[in-house]
Amino acid sequence: MKKFVYIVFILLLSFVNKSLFAQNSNEVTAKMILGNPKYQGMCYGGYRTNTRDKEPTVSEVKEDLKILAAINIKIIRTYNLHHEEILNVLKAITELKKENPKFEMYVMLGAWIDCKNAWTEFPPIHEEESQRNAIEIQKAVELTNQYPEIIKIISVGNEAMVKWATSYYVTPDIILKWVNHLQELKKQEKLPKNLWITSSDNYLSWGGGDAQYHTEDLNKLIEAVDFISMHTYPIHDERFFPEIWGVKENEANLSDKMKIDTAMVRARDYAISQYNGVVKYMKSIGVNKPVEMGETGWTTIDAIYYGVEGSKAADEYKAAQYYKLMREWSNKQKITCFYFEVFDENWKDGSNPNGYENHFGLFNLQNQAKFALWDKIDKGIFKGLTRNGKPITKTYDGNEKALWQDVKVPRFINKQN
């Protein structure tokens, strides 16, 4: 009798284990998401005013997420944990999943990392870290365990190692410390085993350019992360390297549109070259793992550097071309591109409404889709959807001729305007 009971117990235990495995086998993991064109990525911030003092509400975030879902975005990237926005994002996704079990949205959760004295009146100490970093990491752990079905990736830092971030950058050993900490928590089953850990940073920080970044600590970091999340911004780089942007002399007889289109293809190729530089360095140290594009984008307005008085790079047509080209390339190569970004955010340069940082969105703050998404409106993709309670319309009232009044041909390369 005891033997019979024991056999029944073993069979029941086996059944339970198989059931649990079946449930786990249905889990969508970072490994399944990244590099999969079915899971398009986007950088998200939902702030609607020129300050972050007013957080987007759960209802407002739900509006945003429905818009994102309409254009097939299924994973969003966030940046920090010291604002209520991320909590509202997670609550909004949870509510939308309850309302519609087929709704899919996942999160690459950003934990902000600073050096000691960052954003203070004291000189930054880049080799030491802010006490706030430990709080960010702990909060990331807590939220990931609370929302494991939503949070699939933790990113330690945002452009936290690149040396032009002079007010806050840290040395790679600080990022490595926290990546190793999170990886150890996974081993201890204190974080989901399928959670992926990375850091999101400029291509330079990942070894894709200047040799000053090629350090032993960087090599250890590359080995420690589950994948590399690199950033590339041709529109920023052309400000410092003007030879990469503009019209070549042998293109002088092209139409204005063809001159612009050709320049945008070169901008895409420049971004690809930075991506390839990161891959090349990674492989040179004997590592082979996924490299995704954690950020790239193109601003549509600027009063100084990239506008009419500058390089003539910022407008909706060029931004639309860049978006299209980068999506086509990344999808073909099966590389996840977290495009920057979905909505304009005017808090980034709150005292300068026409500052370029405010206008990277595919939508402006007047609930209008920019030129990159006009075709989605034509197809009725946003029908019934709202932002701030108002329907989504086109910029320029949908008048392409009016749009072209703001599109200028870039300068000739190696020539004065």
State the predicted function of each range:
Residues 7-16:
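Bacterial N-terminal signal peptides
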Residues 24-26, 88-195:
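Substrate-binding cleft of extracellular glycoside hydrolase catalytic domains
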Residues 25-31, 37, 304-325, 329-417:
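Aromatic-rich peripheral "rim/lid" segments of glycoside hydrolase catalytic domains that contact
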Residues 25-29, 63, 88, 135-142, ...:
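Alpha-helical scaffolding within the catalytic cores
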Residues 29, 34-110, 119, 130-137:
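N-terminal carbohydrate-binding/catalytic regions of secreted carbohydrate-active enzymes
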Residues 54-56, 77-89, 115-117, 130-133, ...:
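Acidic-and-aromatic substrate-binding clefts and catalytic sites of carbohydrate-active enzymes
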Residues 76, 154, 228, 293-295, ...:
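Conserved, mostly hydrophobic/aromatic
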Residues 130, 161, 167-293, 299, ...:
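Noncatalytic carbohydrate-binding groove/subsite architecture in carbohydrate-active enzymes
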